[in-house]
A protein has these predicted regions:
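Active-site catalytic loop in hydrolytic enzyme cores
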Residues: 86-160, 172-181, 244-251
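Active-site-proximal beta-strand elements of phosphoester/diester hydrolases
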Residues: 1-10, 106, 139-147, 166
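C-terminal beta-strand edge segments of enzyme domains
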Residues: 106, 132, 199-269
């Protein structure tokens, strides 16, 4: 899989302009899968406008992205506020993946951030479970920003057979050091590729650092976009490298073994 990490500034609340920017970035690199940031469609700092900007996953914006994916024979993953198709008024902070055949996959952020400058729980309802995507023939586990700090979510994906872990994010400059400590650990402990696509630029009083990056299944840095600038980076993701890493350090095998009940050490009643 050729995976493109894309970071370009969003225009707050302007979905049409952000889709134009998406299309422009798609033409700057050749890839099988393009990864855009959290809430790319609207920008992150829309606050109480998110419920007004939210769309169902079969709405106009996703339909337009389907056309881009079909035309370029690629998959596109991006963040947007989605309106629940079950409960009126419920809005999720979602990652949406559109494949070239028109297939739509969706993951809703499990832990909306609600501390410091973040007030996501005022506007978004949390998701219910991890969702394993299939993209370009690979199994891909998706999380959104703060979800990354809950290693059990990513381990669940790895146990389910994920080759690649993806985090789309809107991480400000003050969070950079924490995020960059975690990426190689998540890759190495799960023996998966780890890819991160961040917002970049200023929105209201928040500055996003960019620095989208990817790691191999042993935790080695493969590529990193520029900090604080529009940029795109392309990495190659190989299933054989995942298989080799898991043979050399079988943490997933032993995780599954540890989770299996055993009579050893049990007291008899």
């Amino acid at each position: 899989m050729r995976l493109a990490l894309v970071q370009t500034p969003c225009k707050l609340g302007d979905k049409l302009e952000n889709m134009r920017r998406m299309e422009r970035m798609l033409d700057q690199a050749d890839a099988d899968v393009y990864l855009f940031s959290e809430l790319f469609l609207t920008g992150y700092m829309c606050r109480d406008r998110h419920p007004l900007l939210a769309e169902p996953v079969d709405g106009k914006s996703v339909t337009r992205v389907q056309g881009m994916a079909e035309q370029r024979d690629c998959s596109i993953v991006f963040g947007m506020p989605t309106a629940s198709d079950v409960y009126t008024g419920v809005v999720h902070n979602s990652a949406v993946a559109v494949s070239p055949d028109g297939t739509i996959q969706r993951y809703d952020k499990l832990v909306p951030a609600n501390f410091g400058p973040f007030e996501e729980r005022l506007y978004f309802t949390h998701g219910l479970s991890p969702v394993l995507f299939t993209l370009a023939g690979m199994k891909v586990g998706v999380v959104i920003c703060y979800d990354l700090f809950f290693p059990e979510f990513l381990r669940e994906y790895a146990v389910q057979g994920a080759d690649l872990l993806v985090c789309i994010s809107a991480s400000p400059a003050t969070s950079r050091e924490q995020f960059e400590r975690i990426f190689p650990a998540r890759a190495a402990e799960n023996t998966c590729y780890m890819a991160y696509a961040n917002q970049v630029g200023a929105q209201l009083n928040m500055v996003f650092f960019g620095g989208s990056q990817a790691y191999g299944p042993r935790g080695d840095l493969l590529a990193r976009c520029k900090y604080y600038e529009e940029d795109i980076a392309v990495v190659e993701v190989y299933q054989r490298e995942v298989a080799l890493a898991r043979r050399m350090r079988p943490t997933l095998r032993d995780t599954i073994a540890c989770a299996t009940p055993s009579e050893a050490g049990q007291e008899k009643s």
